[in-house]
Amino acid sequence: MFNPHVLDVPAVIFDNGSGLCKAGVSGEIGPRHVINSVLGHRKFNMPSARLNQYFVGQEALYKFDALHLHYPIKRGLVTGWDDMEKLWKHLFEWELGVKPSQQPVLMTEPSLNPREIREKLAEMMFENFSVPGFYLSNHAVAALYASACVTGLVVDSGDGVTCAVPIFEGYSLPHAVTKLYTAGRDITEHLTQLLFANGFNFPCILNKAVANNIKEKLCYIALEPEKELRKSRGEVLGAYRLPDGHVIHFGDELYQVPEVLFAPDQLGIHSPGLSKMVSSSIMKCDTDIQNKLYAEIVLSGGTTLFPGLEERLMKEVEQLASKGTPIKITASPDRCFSAWIGASIMTSMSSFKQMWVTSADFKEYGTSVVQRRCF
């Protein structure tokens, strides 16, 4: 028998990303735990009850030499279901210390998430974890909520995908969503390749963690890349101390690498860059709301944290929009957690209680219930 009072308990919130999973409890100002979305399975089978057969998150990355690393979320979509189940189990039991059967669960999902993935998420939560209530919230809608808005355009860029999502009165407009499959992971790989191509000789192997760190600490978006190249050619623009103590110096690579967000053709990807994505998404919307979207552009996701990105986007969107169009870009300092924070706010509201898909609903209608109830 379903007990409706279980929906009064603070919800567990999972913001599942290609690179990081953010987990916490509704009503809090940020996620309690942020872990790498990776599982490591032992390369050699060692049947022993005392030995972990797999490792999760940072621990898996530390032991990468002895493990096969699996990333269950690719380009924002769950593809490795067994590993994803293990990751959620780890978050429930070891990170949050909660019993899934005693708290409802909200998960964020990417725009245009395929039906089969949405239904599989519901099936797994209700059947494998016995949750009393479940909801799928559009990642961009949740991020916009964190900015106290219900109408606007969210530019979201994480580890696996970059997208522009127009939202009107709390609902995303799927026909106008634009996606670019260039994001944080591609920039890290591009950085590694560019450094080796430019003849950098590293005293230690440049692994992904070091490359990521260089990207996050030193890379930036140039306001005018061609001018920057003329101005800085041959100059040292930044230095980084490797784990073994050696210091390496960088030049033009620091702005050339993230430039792929605005010019993806540099990676051989024939898609519009960030500024044209924004313009294209807005132009696909009804003319009556276009100005409202330009007036509330919200940045979300860790890959939007590059210094200079907000200014460059503003400059180019102004050039693409009709003359005199008021444009505002909001770039919250904690925008890497925007979707999680928005979901926390959403689930804290008393009106949200009626939104939950309950275990009784699932039992009566099956997996298709999420198609009707989660927008």
UniProtKB/Swiss-Prot annotation:
GO terms for biological process: negative regulation of DNA-templated transcription; regulation of smoothened signaling pathway. One of its GO terms (cellular component) is cytoskeleton. Keywords: Cytoplasm, Cytoplasmic vesicle, Cytoskeleton, Nucleus, Transcription, Transcription regulation. PANTHER family: ACTIN. InterPro entries: Actin, ATPase_NBD. One of its GO terms (molecular function) is chromatin binding. Negatively regulates the Hedgehog (SHH) signaling. Binds to the promoter of the SHH signaling mediator, GLI1, and inhibits its expression. The gene is ACTRT1. SMART domains: ACTIN. Belongs to the actin family. Coiled coil: none annotated. Transmembrane segments: none annotated. It is found in: Cytoplasm, Cytoskeleton; Cytoplasm; Nucleus; Cytoplasmic vesicle, Secretory vesicle, Acrosome. Signal peptide: none annotated. This is Actin-related protein T1. The lineage of its organism: Eukaryota, Metazoa, Chordata, Craniata, Vertebrata. It comes from the Eukaryota.
